[in-house]
Amino acid sequence: MALGGLYKRYQIGEQQLTTTSVITCPPNRKLDGIHEKSTPLMLDWQDQDLINMWLDPSLTDSEAFRHLLTGELMTSITATPIKGARDLSARGETLEIVKD
């Protein structure tokens, strides 16, 4: 899985900064209990045409991606609940969440 995001580089004096953000979509009911507020834009990394289009810096028309901004799961995911950000050990069974 790849996440759809944006980045921008800034030059401030001698320092170059890069900022990033992950694009979010409306929540998906299949992710209730995991992430209820929004769904990150998930791109199917095996769809090489989509990935190439996403990474093409000459493509500036965001309408080409409107169909992806629905919150629909475009790819199946596997999720394992963990104890916390500092303890990545599993605290439950792994779930298979099938794409829409």
List each model region and its residues.
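Short linear sequence motif anchored by a di-proline
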Residues: 1-100
